[in-house]
């Protein structure tokens, strides 16, 4: 993996490479990161304020350029600038601690910038709200061009532990799907993104509940082929999505974009400092996601709870096509988790394990070191599988 900070923290290097592989430009990244090289050596937690300041300054510069371009009537240029500004600020916000007073204001600004990007860069993407247990789940819906001619299949794309629907948007996976005639619902499910930050909706083990709400909403749309609704989850979504597909039988296929078969076991390893962590301020973030704020001094009790975030006895109940895509050198989730999910998915009519090697790239966590490569592989598999299901 390209590591901008040779002696810096994994979390920062992962953030840089993820941003570059989601449409970021290397010159802009260099101008943001060069001033904080010394801060990187101070450690991921201590250096986070400097990271935010540097990346926010880059965002401010792009926003000013976008506004100037828009005033001049150069809407394509403005749209590209809004898109990259959204990408950069999303990554900076991801690094912040839950307790950081900058977190919510930064996220709200990110929402505003993303909306500008939709208007000028991605007009087929729109903000939607999914009814869910007396409230709503925020999401972005990409209507594939194929919907101009009738209903199209759709993928529900779900987050992991620390990503947001804005990261999904920046990844351009929805665009790869759209080019193959497939729409995409980028969902901030409970425990992620806007649902967590602004609505206080925390993660739940029974992911089929919110997945069912998404399917209910999609089935009511005239532009959706209700017989071909699939689910794709990256990172911790490699637990969320298979669990949903096992029990929400209206889902027609499932992809674990990074297997997360036994998340509880991974947490116990992290307590012993085995493996890399995805974000600074890790335990504060994890406890927030699961609604266990304030339990920092009761981590053993949380680890007992986390043991239930496990797909043993679950993937056996998946009865639809199931793809597991995993990097051979994933430093967060060991490859053995992918093999466990594959070996136990005995009732899937089409199960496939795709391991990405160092020789080809996309070998790090969810393929962030070569995100377009794994993204297009998954999009091709989804398109092929939906075509098979239509026959």
For the regions a protein language model found, what residue spans apply to each?
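Catalytic active-site module of serine/aspartate enzymes centered on a nucleophile-bearing elbow/loop
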Residues: 367-391
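Alpha/beta-hydrolase active-site loop
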Residues: 201-223
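Short alpha-helix in the alpha/beta-hydrolase fold that links the catalytic acid
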Residues: 320, 334-344
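Catalytic histidine neighborhood in serine/cysteine hydrolases
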Residues: 342-363
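Primarily recognizes the serine-hydrolase "nucleophile elbow" in alpha/beta-hydrolase
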Residues: 90, 217-272
